[in-house]
Amino acid sequence: SFPVIGIPGTIDNDIQGTRFTLGYDTALNTVIDAIDKIRDTASSHNRLFFVEVMGRDAGHIALNAGIGAGAEEILIPEEDMGLERLLESLKRSEKSGKTSSIVVVAEGDKTGKNVFEIASYIENNLPYYEVRVSVLGHMQRGGTPSCFVRALASRMGVFAVESLLEGNSNKMVGIIDENITLTPLEEAIKGKSRINNNLIRVSDILSI
């Protein structure tokens, strides 16, 4: 048999056995930069923007980028917010004096509707805002790797080679609690990394 050590690479950050995957932090920075630019036009034109990011099965990008970019609401697959609750939250924002808002939507959010259907529902029930949709799409998969990703890739690469030389195989390199670790491949592909519930709580607090 051929010895194999895997290294996790996906922007979705949804692989079990590692806290971070290669590409995730770069995608976060790309998304936050885009939302910051969208915020500029939203603020100057009284607009409500729905920004769709990748994450059909996991909301890591939407949740962390949404918090980092100061989004008013975040819709992710792991939490069923519901359109009525979203509408009420945006109404509260409007009454508090906000002239613009950003809603970050993971492409697999729990509403069962796509971002254009969600935006249409809100626009029909919240006429104050001029509603717009921005789908960031595949730009999230490109770009120059962040410093964090470069350093992590180097650490994982060195550890992977050393693990092979020590006779290990059929395992995946990961990072857990700042330590580089090994997880059996069959265990790594069996499940998905979970959203940090404390981040959901932080998001809920910041949206008030």
Task: Locate the predicted segments by residue.
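Phosphate-binding loop/pocket of nucleotide- and phosphate-handling active sites
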Residues: 171-208
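Acidic/polar active-site rim loop that often engages polyanionic ligands
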Residues: 7-20, 43-44, 69
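Short beta-strand elements at the ligand-binding edges of bilobed clamshell
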Residues: 17-26, 143-150
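Catalytic, metal-anchored helix/loop core of enzyme active sites in primary metabolism
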Residues: 139-154, 161-165
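Short gly/pro/ser/thr-enriched loop/turn and capping motifs at secondary-structure boundaries
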Residues: 10-15, 81-83, 111, 140-141
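Short glycine/threonine-rich loop-to-helix capping motif typified by GTGT followed
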Residues: 113-118, 144-151, 183-191
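Accessory alpha-helical/coil subdomains and C-terminal extensions
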Residues: 3, 24-133
